[in-house]
Amino acid sequence: PEELVLTVRAGTALAEIEAELAQANQMLAFEPADLSGLLASKSTGTIGGVLATNMSGPRRLTAGAARDFLLGFDAVSGRGERFKSGGRVMKNVTGYDLSKLMCGSYGTLAVVDEVTIKTLPRPETSLSLLFGCNDMGSAVAKIAAIFASPHEPGAAAILPQNVAVAAGIDMTAAFIVVIRLE
């Protein structure tokens, strides 16, 4: 990935993309969730699946959704016609922005074959803070207080206790607030 732009086939595994980006000290800003640990299964997610569902992870609050990082794509319409939308550079302002429309369409508008996405430099350091909360209201209040503070969290999530336990977090509170500082 050069110039913080990556072009891949839609069926490319997320694990493969993340490994390549890690070598270049880059990352996917929207941080798609890897649910394989929670589901006790092998990670099989693809970048096409992430974009078709617009699945954005805990960094969405600060970085934006997956659709905000799709620069362009090649696809096949329902009539079997190949078409392209967007571009391979950030300064592409011609025509309609079909990229945002395609994200979250679950493949109903076209079959995407290739995507070009914007990447970001990986932070030099990262620290996750965990807070136990006994109810959802206090968990939401904790996140609101942190985002209202002078600190700039990179990601935030609220995990129910059963999900936290499945992820290997040993805390007894009903909800676990996870805040990442970068």
Residue ranges of model-derived segments:
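N-terminal glycine-rich flavin-associated loop
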Residues: P1-S43, L51, M55-R88, V93, ...
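C-terminal substrate-binding/cap subdomain adjacent to the FAD-binding core in PCMH-type
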Residues: A52, L71-E182
